[in-house]
Amino acid sequence: MDSRPIGFLDSGVGGLTVVKEMFRQLPEEEVIFIGDQARAPYGPRPAQQIREFTWQMVNFLLTKNVKMIVIACNTATAVAWQEIKEKLDIPVLGVILPGASAAIKSTNSGKVGIIGTPMTVKSDAYRQKIQALSPNTAVVSLACPKFVPIVESNQMSSSLAKKVVYETLSPLVGKLDTLILGCTHYPLLRPIIQNVMGAEVKLIDSGAETVRDISVLLNYFEINHNWQNKHGGHHFYTTASPKGFKEIAEQWLSQEINVERIVL
């Protein structure tokens, strides 16, 4: 048993969708989360800069003595996960492989769509993973650069959100039966995305799928938290306004949290 926390990182608040699923599936585990809101979104940035920012968050989490790191950001996973995984001596998970695997299991038509940030789509990481596992699966990718700013500005239920999602996703409607939400911000827009795509399209939340892998690794390495040892509580950090982060986080997680601002 291991009472150390699990570290989560993201470019902003999107990774909270993974944390929410973590609270549901593994409530005994302690979470330390950092969101780099001051520099979000990561999607339009060059790969080297994304790699640098991701390492800064990783190094911050390491100072908190975490037992595992979850890169709860598709863009950072696509650019930096492999390198970080190879250099650290604790488990490091990304969100792309779990989402790709779930999509393959879900599709009946063999037609899968991926929506993500420009960098995630440019990296081609999802398509490569899917076609390595299932070569006959047809994959179409679409960058959605306007989605993250809508979530980060807490406009998920606005008429603007509905308009942007409809206009962005229209080219995909009727062309697939499974759609990967290839950015951890996107589940916060899930009701609108589902409405645009149609009830028959299965939406894959890569973050939720990742939590299943977290559970497997905790058991494999025997580093689960013991229910009998009460943990020190969850800790949330942002590089921007704690007030803005707290508002979105409490709304999404349905619980009060404490948020600290840090400078990386």
From Swiss-Prot:
It catalyses: L-glutamate = D-glutamate. One of its GO terms (biological process) is regulation of cell shape. Keywords: Cell shape, Cell wall biogenesis/degradation, Isomerase, Peptidoglycan synthesis. It holds the Pfam family Asp_Glu_race. It is an enzyme of class 5 (isomerase). Belongs to the aspartate/glutamate racemases family. Pathway: Cell wall biogenesis; peptidoglycan biosynthesis. Transmembrane segments: none annotated. The active site is at C73, C183. PANTHER family: GLUTAMATE RACEMASE (PTHR21198:SF2). The lineage of its organism: Bacteria, Bacillati, Bacillota, Bacilli, Lactobacillales. One of its GO terms (molecular function) is glutamate racemase activity. InterPro entries: Asp/Glu/hydantoin_racemase, Asp/Glu_race, Asp/Glu_racemase_AS_1, Asp/Glu_racemase_AS_2, Glu_race. Its EC number is 5.1.1.3. Provides the (R)-glutamate required for cell wall biosynthesis. Substrate binds at D10, S11, Y42, G43, N74, T75, T184, H185. This is Glutamate racemase. The keyword Ribosomal protein does not apply. It comes from the Bacteria.
